[in-house]
C-alpha cells in the first residue's frame, strides 16, 4: 500500500493525497452479494431533514457483509480477493467456502488473496479467524466484536480499528478499545483476530469539495453565518463570534460536550474513554 501525493497540475489536484493498494480487485463485485441502495437525501418518510449534510453522490450498491460468521463453523474458506467497498472505510474480502458458498467479510490487515480462514472454537489463532472471546488468548488484538451473542459485529469495524483483550473474569472478558475505554463483554460473543485493513485511510486527503460531493456529503454552514431564526449563533451586526458557548441548531452544547446517556450499559464500562 502506497501513499501518493498528486502534483499540483490544477487547484483541485494540489492537495490530493491518495492511498493506492495494488492488491484491490479491479473488476466488478460479486453480483449475488449486492443489494439496491436507495438515497434518502437525509429525509424521513415525512420529507423532513433528519440528518443534515446528506444528498447527491455517486450511485452505489450495498455489499452484503457477513458480520456474524456463526453458521460456517469448521468450514474452511479461501480468500478469493480483496475489494473496495464504497459503503465503509475498510476493505472487504470475498471468501469461497469449501461448501461452495461465497460471502463478504471485513478484510483483516495482512490477509490477502489465497489465504485460508476458518471460524469456530477450533480455529487456530491467526488474523482473520473468528472465535468466541473465551477461546481467544489474553493480550490478543481483535476486531469485529459482538456486544450480544449472535447479533453480529458492532465494535471495531472501520479502517484500522481494533481492540485488545486484556482480562478474562467469569462470564466476561475486558477489552481495551482504541478510544482508551475499557469495557466488559460477554465471553460468548464472537470476534475476529487481528485489526481491520486499510489503516492508512486516515492519511488520505480528498483535496477538493467536489470529491466530498461525489461521496454524498453536502456543505456544512456555520451557525454564525445564519440568521437568528435559523441558529442560536445567528444574527448580529457585522461578523460576530456567536456570543455563547458552541451549540447545535437546537441549542444543545456541541464541540466536545458529552452526550452519552445510556445508563443501562454504564455497568459494563470499567474505565471511560480518554
UniProtKB/Swiss-Prot annotation:
One of its GO terms (molecular function) is structural constituent of ribosome. The keyword Ligase does not apply. Keywords: Ribonucleoprotein, Ribosomal protein, RNA-binding, rRNA-binding. Residues 28-54, 224-274 are annotated as: Disordered. It comes from the Bacteria. It holds the Pfam family Ribosomal_L2_C. Residues 263-274 have a biased composition (Basic and acidic residues). SUPFAM superfamilies: Nucleic acid-binding proteins, Translation proteins SH3-like domain. One of its GO terms (cellular component) is large ribosomal subunit. GO terms for biological process: cytoplasmic translation. The keyword NAD does not apply. NCBIfam families: rplB_bact. Part of the 50S ribosomal subunit. Forms a bridge to the 30S subunit in the 70S ribosome. One of the primary rRNA binding proteins. Required for association of the 30S and 50S subunits to form the 70S ribosome, for tRNA binding and peptide bond formation. It has been suggested to have peptidyltransferase activity; this is somewhat controversial. Makes several contacts with the 16S rRNA in the 70S ribosome. Belongs to the universal ribosomal protein uL2 family. This is Large ribosomal subunit protein uL2. It comes from Pseudomonas savastanoi pv. phaseolicola (strain 1448A / Race 6). The lineage of its organism: Bacteria, Pseudomonadati, Pseudomonadota, Gammaproteobacteria, Pseudomonadales. The gene is rplB.
Amino acid at each position: 500500500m502506497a501513499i501518493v501525493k498528486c502534483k499540483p497540475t490544477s487547484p483541485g489536484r494540489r492537495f490530493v493525497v491518495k492511498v493506492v493498494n495494488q492488491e484491490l480487485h479491479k473488476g466488478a463485485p460479486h453480483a449475488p452479494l449486492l443489494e439496491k441502495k436507495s438515497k434518502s437525501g437525509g429525509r424521513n418518510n415525512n420529507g423532513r431533514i433528519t440528518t443534515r449534510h446528506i444528498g447527491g453522490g455517486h450511485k452505489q450498491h450495498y455489499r452484503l457483509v457477513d458480520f456474524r460468521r456463526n453458521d460456517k463453523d469448521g468450514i474452511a474458506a479461501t480468500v478469493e480477493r480483496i475489494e473496495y467497498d464504497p459503503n465503509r472505510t475498510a476493505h472487504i474480502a470475498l471468501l469461497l467456502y469449501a461448501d461452495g458458498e461465497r460471502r463478504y467479510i471485513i478484510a483483516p490487515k495482512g490477509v490477502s488473496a489465497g489465504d485460508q480462514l476458518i471460524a469456530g472454537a477450533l480455529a487456530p489463532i491467526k488474523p482473520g479467524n473468528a472465535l468466541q472471546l473465551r477461546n481467544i488468548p489474553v493480550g490478543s488484538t481483535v476486531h469485529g466484536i459482538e456486544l450480544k451473542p449472535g447479533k453480529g459485529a458492532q465494535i471495531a469495524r472501520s479502517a484500522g480499528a481494533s481492540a485488545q483483550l486484556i482480562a478474562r473474569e467469569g462470564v466476561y472478558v475486558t477489552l481495551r478499545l482504541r478510544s482508551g475505554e475499557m469495557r466488559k463483554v460477554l465471553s460468548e460473543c464472537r470476534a475476529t483476530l487481528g485489526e481491520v485493513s486499510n489503516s492508512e485511510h486516515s492519511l488520505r486527503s480528498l483535496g477538493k469539495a467536489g470529491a466530498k460531493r461525489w461521496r454524498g456529503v453536502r456543505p456544512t454552514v456555520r451557525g454564525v453565518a445564519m440568521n437568528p431564526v435559523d441558529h442560536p449563533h445567528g444574527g448580529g451586526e457585522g461578523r460576530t463570534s456567536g456570543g455563547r458557548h458552541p451549540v447545535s441548531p437546537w441549542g444543545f452544547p456541541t464541540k466536545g460536550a458529552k452526550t452519552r446517556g445510556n445508563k443501562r450499559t454504564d455497568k459494563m464500562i470499567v474505565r471511560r474513554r480518554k
